């Protein structure tokens, strides 16, 4: 189980994620002794927390592997959940970033993503634009996926 604890607006909140089986994960939010549950019926490859939308409350950022309405091939996606009055609510259930998502990390409350381009890999920063994630800038490019993971300083999963 991965857990993060933050004090937000004088209330303690804690997002956790736990695997139930190979395709079911429980995302939980504990706020002042109460717990909210959101079931994710997809494999999870990454979990992080950050104040993505800048509202002063920590959000859960979950990488899932699934198909979407517009992209029917299963692939890696980014879902963002918020704390709404002590309940887990979707903030953004992304179907795609700019390119094919390989992995992501959180840097300065932004999503830093490795994406596959035609002949290389691109590391880009994405920030909240009021509706979803918008690319701020490309911060690194390489023909080597390992170089991109090293740049992100995360373990390949």
Language model: regions and residue ranges:
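Bacterial N-terminal signal peptides
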Residues: 1-5
